[in-house]
C-alpha cells in the first residue's frame, strides 16, 4: 500500500468525528428527547431537538469534507 493509499490524519479525523456524531444521533439523542417529553419539560425537548438538528448538519458537513478528501480536493 502506498503512502497515498493510506488513511491520512485528516481523513481519520473526519471519520472519527462522524462516528462520534452518528453514535450520539442513533444511540442517545432520542432517549434524551423522550426523557424531556416524559418530564413535561418542553424547553429541554427544544434544546435536545436543536442539538440533534445541529449534529445532523455537522454529519452532512463532514460527509462533504470526506468526499473532498477522497477526491483529493
Outline where the language-model segments fall.
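Iron-associated oxidoreductase/ferritin-like identity signal
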Residues: 1-73
Amino acid at each position: 500500500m502506498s503512502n497515498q493509499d493510506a488513511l491520512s490524519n485528516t481523513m481519520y479525523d473526519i471519520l472519527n468525528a462522524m462516528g462520534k456524531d452518528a453514535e450520539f444521533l442513533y444511540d442517545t439523542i432520542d432517549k434524551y428527547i423522550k426523557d424531556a417529553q416524559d418530564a413535561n419539560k418542553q424547553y429541554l425537548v427544544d434544546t435536545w431537538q436543536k442539538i440533534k438538528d445541529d449534529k445532523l448538519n455537522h454529519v452532512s458537513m463532514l460527509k462533504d469534507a470526506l468526499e473532498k478528501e477522497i477526491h483529493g480536493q
